């Protein structure tokens, strides 16, 4: 058995994801696949368009063997923490052999070079980084500029190599890949990394063309504007389309950030700058800007646009407001990191091969496998606190269901993992 690990959101599972799955299995020669997938809230500070069990079901029906949930506290975090949470989870399972992620560059070597520098920064690199941060831009841009300057100074790279590294630092999936590699190094993990080029659609593309591949962003944008599934039929597997149609039909999808608009504005207007200061990723006096803008804006979009700046991107603002909604504080994140990251592996969906993987994990995993919360007792305070955030996230997410009968709390206790029986 050779187990391939994937880090995913599947929002929703589309043809590009299926291509990534098939190519990853081919280049790694893996026999089994496990995907760590975000739950009901995602890394860009948005809710998933359909709940986590249905997205896991889409993936298993399209060939992923096992889906494990990335705890909410990491799923909604910065690229660095998102990657750390996901890689730590795969590492702690004990028998994952390799990792394959999509990237714009399609070559793991330059990403490994960058990860090496960022993982063990010299005093000179830190000095150059401070210089660029003080110029006032966003941290990712400052870090990219500092890295290029530092590498030029070392004179260890030719012009072509520097150009390749420069290009790598401009693309979101490359940056996320670098964070995966940093986490593997930090954990001294035996998991072997691979990458493949993303096929066709750009990560941020908002258009669905005649191609069979479209970005998840384009699919969500289409559903938000057109409010029908017909236009996405060519870019998602049939199972994804059927599951989406069912969820839409019973009032459980699609879910968008605007569904939480009134809740968020209410929370902000009853908060104080002192309260906001405790929310994770709020720093440098940003709480005052958020507080002021919340009393001027009447929609979420107005709020995002009012708060964002050259230093604080819209995506970062979206994440911060999601942390507020879910009450994820700085103390929470520091506490979880101090206790080694994810404390359990929650099973969302699996097939017969997934069952074989779970059997393997029984003897290798350093964290408990959780299939039914009714039968799970957190083994320590970190697990208890982490699980409380996961449950809170689902309880709030279900408030966006248009069928009020389905919006009750404790869905985490009432929903079992999906099992795909190959004999059916």
UniProtKB/Swiss-Prot annotation:
Single Gene Ontology BP annotation: tRNA modification
Record's subcellular location: Cytoplasm
Alphabetic keyword roster: ATP-binding, Cytoplasm, Ligase, Nucleotide-binding, RNA-binding, tRNA processing, tRNA-binding
Catalyses which reaction(s): cytidine(34) in elongator tRNA(Met) + acetate + ATP = N(4)-acetylcytidine(34) in elongator tRNA(Met) + AMP + diphosphate
Protein family: Belongs to the TmcAL family.
Protein's name in the database: tRNA(Met) cytidine acetate ligase
Any single Gene Ontology cellular-component annotation: cytoplasm
Pfam family, one: HIGH_NTase1
Keyword Secreted: no
Superkingdom of this protein's organism: Bacteria
Any one GO molecular-function label of the UniProt entry: ligase activity, forming carbon-nitrogen bonds
EC code(s) of this entry: 6.3.4.-
Top-tier EC class: ligase
Binding site for ATP: 7-20, 102, 173, 198
Primary location class: cytoplasm
Described function: Catalyzes the formation of N(4)-acetylcytidine (ac(4)C) at the wobble position of elongator tRNA(Met), using acetate and ATP as substrates. First activates an acetate ion to form acetyladenylate (Ac-AMP) and then transfers the acetyl group to tRNA to form ac(4)C34.
Origin species: Alkaliphilus oremlandii (strain OhILAs)
HAMAP family: TmcAL (MF_01539)
InterPro entries the record matches: Rossmann-like_a/b/a_fold, tRNA(Met)_cyd_acetate_ligase
């Amino acid at each position: 058995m050779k187990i391939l690990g994937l880090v995913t959101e599947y929002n929703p599972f589309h043809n590009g994801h299926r291509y990534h799955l098939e190519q990853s299995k081919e280049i790694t020669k893996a026999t089994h696949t496990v995907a760590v997938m975000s739950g009901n809230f995602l890394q860009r500070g948005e809710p998933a368009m359909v709940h986590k069990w249905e997205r896991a079901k889409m993936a298993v029906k399209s060939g992923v063997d096992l889906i494990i949930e990335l705890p909410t506290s990491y799923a909604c975090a910065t690229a660095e923490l998102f990657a750390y949470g996901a890689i730590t989870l795969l590492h702690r399972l004990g028998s994952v052999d390799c990792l394959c992620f999509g990237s714009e560059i399609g070559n793991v070597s330059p990403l490994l070079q960058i990860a090496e520098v960022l993982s063990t920064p010299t005093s000179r690199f830190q000095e150059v980084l401070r210089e660029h941060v003080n110029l006032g831009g966003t941290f990712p841009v400052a870090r990219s500029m500092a890295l290029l300057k530092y590498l030029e100074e070392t004179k260890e790279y030719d012009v072509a190599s520097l150009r390749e590294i420069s290009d790598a630092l401009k693309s979101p999936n490359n940056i996320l890949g670098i964070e995966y590699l940093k986490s593997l190094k930090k954990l001294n993990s035996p998991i072997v990394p691979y990458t493949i080029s993303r096929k066709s659609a750009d990560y941020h593309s908002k258009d669905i063309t005649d191609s069979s591949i479209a970005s998840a962003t384009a699919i969500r944008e289409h559903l938000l504007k057109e409010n029908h599934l017909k236009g996405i039929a060519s870019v998602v597997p049939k199972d994804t389309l059927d599951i989406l149609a069912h969820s839409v039909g019973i009032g459980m999808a699609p879910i968008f950030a605007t569904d939480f608009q009134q809740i968020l504005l209410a929370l902000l207007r009853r908060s104080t700058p002192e309260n906001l200061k405790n929310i994770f990723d709020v720093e440098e006096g940003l709480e005052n800007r958020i507080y002021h803008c919340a009393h001027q804006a009447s929609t979420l979009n107005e709020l995002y646009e009012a708060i964002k700046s050259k230093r604080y991107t819209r995506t970062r603002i979206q994440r911060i407001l999601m942390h507020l909604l879910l009450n994820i504080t700085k103390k929470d994140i520091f506490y979880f990191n101090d206790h080694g990251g994810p404390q359990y592996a929650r099973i969302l969906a699996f097939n017969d091969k997934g069952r074989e993987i779970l059997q393997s994990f029984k003897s290798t995993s350093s964290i408990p496998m959780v299939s039914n919360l009714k039968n799970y007792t957190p083994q320590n305070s970190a697990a208890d606190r982490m699980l409380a955030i996961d449950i809170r996230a689902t309880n709030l997410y279900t408030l966006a269901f248009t069928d009020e009968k389905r919006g009750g709390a404790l869905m985490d206790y009432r929903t079992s993992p999906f099992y795909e029986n190959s004999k059916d």
